[in-house]
Every structure is written in structure tokens, then in C-alpha cells.
């Protein structure tokens, strides 16, 4: 493990840490029953019945897993 040769000042430490930013989450749009739905890419979608009960997971139009 690398060991720093000198102590890093509080100012330099904080300015270095301030450059780190969380990446904005990417969303994919899909149309479900005539409504636009946003979801994360490469994740399965939960298919529900009219009462809202989850039935199964769907990915790229295929049934993946029963719930």
C-alpha cells in the first residue's frame, strides 16, 4: 500500500474531495399500457394485474421469473 510522504493539508484534502460527484442515473423510457414508464437500463420490470398484485418479472418482452 502506498504511504504518503507528507501530511496533506485540510484545505487540499477538502478541495480534492469536493471534485467527486455522484453520477446522474440514466433512465430508459418504455411504454406500458399506453403510458410512458421510466426504469433503469438492463433491469427486469415487474408486471402486475389490474389490482396491482405483482405477477412476474419481464425483461425485453420475455417472462423471466414468477413472483
Curated annotation (Swiss-Prot):
SUPFAM superfamilies cross-referenced by the UniProt entry: Zn-binding ribosomal proteins (SSF57829)
Basic residues bias (residue ranges): 1-19
GO molecular function: structural constituent of ribosome
Domain of life of the organism encoding this protein: Bacteria
Family matches, as Pfam families: Ribosomal_L32p (PF01783)
Xref: InterPro entries: Ribosomal_bL32, Ribosomal_zn-bd
UniProt region (Disordered), positions on chain: 1-22
Signal peptide limits: none
Membrane spanning residue stretches: none
Keywords: Ribonucleoprotein, Ribosomal protein
Family according to the record: Belongs to the bacterial ribosomal protein bL32 family.
NCBIfam families, alphabetized: rpmF_bact (TIGR01031)
Protein name: Large ribosomal subunit protein bL32
Species assigned in the record: Kineococcus radiotolerans (strain ATCC BAA-149 / DSM 14245 / SRS30216)
Encoding gene per record: rpmF
Amino acid at each position: 500500500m502506498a504511504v504518503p510522504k507528507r501530511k496533506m493539508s485540510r484545505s487540499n484534502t477538502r478541495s480534492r474531495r469536493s471534485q467527486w460527484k455522484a453520477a446522474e442515473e440514466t433512465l430508459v423510457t418504455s411504454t406500458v399500457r399506453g403510458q410512458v414508464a421510466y426504469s433503469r437500463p438492463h433491469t427486469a420490470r415487474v408486471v402486475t394485474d389490474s389490482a396491482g398484485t405483482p405477477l412476474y418479472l419481464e425483461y425485453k418482452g420475455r417472462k423471466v421469473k414468477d413472483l
